[in-house]
Amino acid sequence: SKDVEVIDIGEMSVVPGFIDSHSHLPWSGDRTNELAMRLRGKTYREIAKSGGGIMKTVRDTRSTPKRNLIASGISRVQECIRNGTTTLEAKSGYGLDLDSEVKLLESISEINRSTDIDIRATWLGAHDFPPEMGREDYVEHLISDQLPVISELSLAKWVDVFCEEGWFTNDQTEDIVKAS
């Protein structure tokens, strides 16, 4: 048709933007050594029992100031953009206690305001069990303490639970999801 503009892009391609449906933007620490452990056949559970895994990142993230989490998150988003991502879901989950989970979700909100990408925040308070609280007490804490605050502050529209053997059970997951 005469009304269609044709743009010659030579040997290049036009593709839709990528959507990253699972990311953690604000976090701190380094677990690259765990990749080699996985390649040698270690299970995630074995790595966690040896002091690695989620709790390693939780320890590092809890002690990191929010401004540093935001700066590193923005850097990660810029890399995503360079690689074609236009939308991503960003999970919390490396704080576990209320103050740290709020810090992570506020960081995600600030990263979203500071970058040219569509970021959707997900609360993942049920990522692991913190050492300072028993499992059932923690599930109750998530439902009674964290969820109401996260909801009141409108920090996340979605909820995720790490439902896997050794972590949250099907029943615990169902209780958390129903409460959300």
Give the location of each predicted region.
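Short glycine/proline-enriched coil/turn segments at helix->beta-strand junctions
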Residues: 2-3, 155
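Metal-associated gating/positioning segment near the N- to mid-region
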Residues: 3-72
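Metal-coordinating catalytic core of metallo-dependent amide/deamination hydrolases
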Residues: 57-72, 78, 86-180
